[in-house]
Structure formats: C-alpha cells, structure tokens
Design a protein with these regions (language model features):
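Structural motif
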Residues: 54-63
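Amphipathic coiled-coil/heptad-repeat helices and related helical stalk/stem segments
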Residues: 31, 59-60, 112-113
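Short glycine-rich, polar/acidic loop-and-turn segments at beta strand-coil junctions
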Residues: 50-52, 82
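Serine-esterase "nucleophile elbow" of acetyl-processing enzymes
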Residues: 1-50, 66-72, 76
Length: 177
C-alpha cells in the first residue's frame, strides 16, 4: 500500500471548519480546523476544496473542475450528506401538507457519491469517505426555527422531532454502504 503524503478534501462546512458563533450570531471559520491540525501533525499536504452549504451535486461539479485543472493527490477525503438530507424548512412551514423533498434525494445522493468515488479511483487516488456527524434533532429543530418559522407547522409535517434524526441516519447509512 502506497504511503499517503497529499490529500484533497471535498465536502461541506464540517470539513471546511465552519462553526456557528453563538456570541456573534453567525458562522465563521475556525482559526485552525481539525483537518489542518491533522495535516501538520502527520506531515501531509492538504488541499481543502470544501465549501459551506455544499451538497454532493455541487461537490461533484467542483471535483470535476479541479481534476480537469490538474488537481492531484494520493487520497481524496469525501464528506457529504448533511446538507443533502436537509429540507427547505421555510417551505415546510408555509405548507405543512405539501410534498417536500430534501435538497438531494437519497437515490441521487448515492449515485453521485459513487460517481465521485469512481472519479477518484480513476485518477489513481485512494477514496476516504467520512460518515455524517451525529445530529441532535431537538437542538437542530430549535436552531432552524429560531427565526420565527412555524414550529407547529413543521412538527405537523415531521410527525415528531426525532424524524430529523431518522432521516439524517438514512443518509449516513448510504455513506456506510
């Protein structure tokens, strides 16, 4: 097995090192995220192509563009799913009886993640896929409804708050496959 000296990361805000700053009431970048610390500790060259709000669809587009431009590493770390499984909560609040779909339907998510893995392998890179970080359904619900979205309407559509966790877990299960 070839020793890895360089890794390209494609993912969302988690991989980018974006965190919510409670005091400032907005998102910001960590001064040094976990990926950067790991690269320094392990002596790896790191190319972080992750973007806040990125779905697997956008990530695949970025990856293709990067590879066409000559981006090359020995490994690729892929971290997607959190934004993909999310809903347009404002639309759900406005129409709790409507048919709402996640940003990336599960089947398309799986298809595009497989396409990313195939592209990485074709480039001679080793794919590394992360699972989704755990979600606390109640805290996430409180977070996205804090601006005044109708909690009652969203709860009607969800059935129960823990549906958020169960839905998120389906995308995590797809990553594990």
């Amino acid at each position: 097995m070839q020793e890895i000296h360089s890794i390209t990361l494609w993912g969302d805000s988690v991989m980018r090192g974006v965190v919510y700053d409670e005091q400032r009431g907005r998102y910001g970048l960590l001064p040094e995220n976990a990926a950067e610390r790991a690269s320094k500790t392990l002596g790896l060259t790191l190319h972080n192509r992750s973007r806040m709000g990125c779905t697997v669809t956008k990530g695949l587009s970025i990856m293709k563009r990067d590879m066409e431009a000559g981006m090359d590493s020995q490994a690729a770390l892929l971290e997607f799913g959190g934004n993909d499984c999310d809903y347009d909560w404002a639309a759900v609040a406005r129409d709790p009886e409507g048919d709402h779909q996640p940003k990336t339907p599960l089947g398309l998510f799986m298809e595009q993640l497989r396409e990313m893995v195939a592209a990485v392998r074709q480039k001679g890179m080793r794919p590394i896929i992360t699972t989704l970080p755990p979600i606390h359904a109640r805290r996430y619900f409180d977070f996205f409804t804090r601006g005044g979205l109708s909690r009652e309407n969203i709860l009607f559509w969800l059935g129960d708050i823990e549906y958020i966790y169960r839905w998120h877990e389906r995308y995590n299960g797809a990553v594990v496959q």
